[in-house]
């Protein structure tokens, strides 16, 4: 299988055709080898139009959703961005092609180690991973020009708002465990925020003190 052709078709048919047009995002999606972020048995499906399992009840998001969420941050290049939920590392890799520095938080040690290994193997040297409860964000490195959350939350954790730079954007799925609305929050002033709904979505739960509890807890 020619993965470069599969990647080009993915971008043309799933990303551009659905309205994602930011050249920085399109170029990043073209450059990152998505198949390397899933198990080898799934490589043939890596560029298909659906999420894939990555272990520990987590998934790598659908390509369109990665592109759409990245575009929704309204990046120009050179920013500092926080990702909540490293997962496979794919979203962080896409962001790393655009911004100066990516800070990404993961609560599951196995996923964090695997993501670090893959990110290093594809040359993403501007990505820092922290193992912690993602609902706290990453206060020491704040403020951030953008924050993207790759798991669904029952509400917007206050730490994200506090760690957003003035003029910065937060993109987060908010709703119940089964379905959410993707929201964009813009910090328009020190104590001022605007919020808009972008689209309906479905993500794995954001687990943590200010998110969901583990099922069975």
From Swiss-Prot:
Q: What is its main location?
A: cytoplasm
* Coiled-coil spans in chain: none
Q: Which Gene3D superfamilies match?
A: Vaccinia Virus protein VP39
Its subcellular locations are: Cytoplasm
Q: Which reaction does it catalyse?
A: [protein]-L-isoaspartate + S-adenosyl-L-methionine = [protein]-L-isoaspartate alpha-methyl ester + S-adenosyl-L-homocysteine
Q: Where is the active site?
A: 61
The EC number of this protein is 2.1.1.77
Q: Which GO terms describe its molecular function?
A: protein-L-isoaspartate (D-aspartate) O-methyltransferase activity
Disulfide-bonded cysteine pairs: these are: none
- Might you report a single GO cellular component term? cytoplasm
Keywords linked to the UniProt accession: Cytoplasm, Methyltransferase, S-adenosyl-L-methionine, Transferase
Q: List membrane-spanning regions.
A: none
Q: A Pfam family name for this chain?
A: PCMT
Any one Gene Ontology biological process term?
protein modification process
Record-linked InterPro entries:
PCMT, SAM-dependent_MTases_sf
Family per UniProt? Answer: Belongs to the methyltransferase superfamily. L-isoaspartyl/D-aspartyl protein methyltransferase family.
Outline what the protein does: Catalyzes the methyl esterification of L-isoaspartyl residues in peptides and proteins that result from spontaneous decomposition of normal L-aspartyl and L-asparaginyl residues. It plays a role in the repair and/or degradation of damaged proteins.
- Please report the name of this protein according to its UniProt entry: Protein-L-isoaspartate O-methyltransferase
Q: Which gene encodes it?
A: pcm
């Amino acid at each position: 299988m020619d993965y470069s052709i599969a990647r080009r078709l993915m971008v043309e048919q799933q990303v551009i055709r659905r309205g994602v047009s930011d050249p920085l995002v399109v170029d990043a999606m073209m450059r990152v080898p998505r198949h390397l972020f899933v198990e080898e048995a799934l490589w043939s499906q890596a560029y298909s139009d659906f999420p894939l399992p990555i272990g520990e009840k987590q998934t790598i998001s659908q390509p369109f959703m990665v592109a759409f969420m990245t575009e929704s941050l309204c990046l120009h290049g050179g920013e500092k961005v926080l990702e909540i939920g490293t997962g496979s590392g794919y979203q962080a890799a896409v962001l790393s092609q655009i911004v100066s520095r990516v800070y990404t938080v993961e609560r599951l040690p196995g996923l964090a180690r695997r993501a670090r290994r893959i990110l290093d193997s594809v040359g993403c040297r501007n990505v820092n991973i922290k193992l912690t409860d993602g609902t706290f964000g990453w206060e020491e490195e704040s403020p951030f020009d953008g924050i993207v959350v790759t798991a669904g939350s029952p509400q917007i954790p206050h730490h994200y708002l506090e760690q957003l730079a003035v003029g910065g954007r937060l993109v987060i799925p908010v709703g119940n465990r089964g379905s959410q609305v993707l929201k964009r929050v813009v910090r328009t002033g020190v104590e001022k925020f605007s919020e808009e709904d972008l689209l309906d979505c479905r993500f794995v739960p954001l687990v943590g003190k200010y998110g969901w509890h583990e099922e069975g807890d």
